[in-house]
Amino acid sequence: MAKKIIGFIKLQIPAGKANPSPPVGPALGQRGLNIMEFCKAFNAQTQGMEPGLPVPVVITAFADKSFTFVMKSPPATVLIKKAAGVQKGSAKPHTDKVGKITRAQAEEIAKAKNADLTAADLDAAVRTIAGSARSMGITVEGL
């Protein structure tokens, strides 16, 4: 018989840097989950990733105080900013441009995000990434 689910917890945690301090500790503690067990498992799974890259994670909490978690790919905005070499997007995205990325960089981001995007094919995923970049004030060349 399947375990009874008592809730889902959605967090964004830097890769390899999960620790019991907020936001991880309070979110897991109020469900009665073992915080250190999660931190060790998360840090072990994110070992190969770039340290500090924010990773969305969905934790499923069960009634017997056990849990499972699913990691998603890093947010598209973070990957776009990294590719463009900027700290933050434009305050006025359609008038002030803050950086540029190429179509090849957009394709690379789309491939990394492909599991989380609902696009039918790679070209549609690239257009989705390009739209996100434009809304941040970053120009996409070759599109």
UniProtKB/Swiss-Prot annotation:
Keywords in alphabetical order: Methylation, Ribonucleoprotein, Ribosomal protein, RNA-binding, rRNA-binding
Output the Gene Ontology cellular-component terms. Answer: cytosolic large ribosomal subunit
Q: What is this protein called?
A: Large ribosomal subunit protein uL11
Q: Which PANTHER family match?
A: 60S RIBOSOMAL PROTEIN L12 (PTHR11661), LARGE RIBOSOMAL SUBUNIT PROTEIN UL11M (PTHR11661:SF1)
Q: Does the keyword rRNA-binding apply?
A: yes
Q: What does this protein do?
A: Forms part of the ribosomal stalk which helps the ribosome interact with GTP-bound translation factors.
How does it associate, per the subunit comment?
Answer: Part of the ribosomal stalk of the 50S ribosomal subunit. Interacts with L10 and the large rRNA to form the base of the stalk. L10 forms an elongated spine to which L12 dimers bind in a sequential fashion forming a multimeric L10(L12)X complex.
Q: Which InterPro entries does the UniProt record give?
A: Ribosomal_uL11, Ribosomal_uL11_bac-typ, Ribosomal_uL11_C, Ribosomal_uL11_C_sf, Ribosomal_uL11_CS, Ribosomal_uL11_N, Ribosomal_uL11_N_sf
Q: Which domain of life is it from?
A: Bacteria
Give the GO terms filed under biological process for this record: translation
| Posttranslational mods | One or more lysine residues are methylated.
Name the family the entry cites. Belongs to the universal ribosomal protein uL11 family.
Q: Name one Pfam family in it.
A: Ribosomal_L11
An example Gene Ontology molecular-function term = large ribosomal subunit rRNA binding
For whether the record's keyword set contains RNA-binding, the answer is: yes
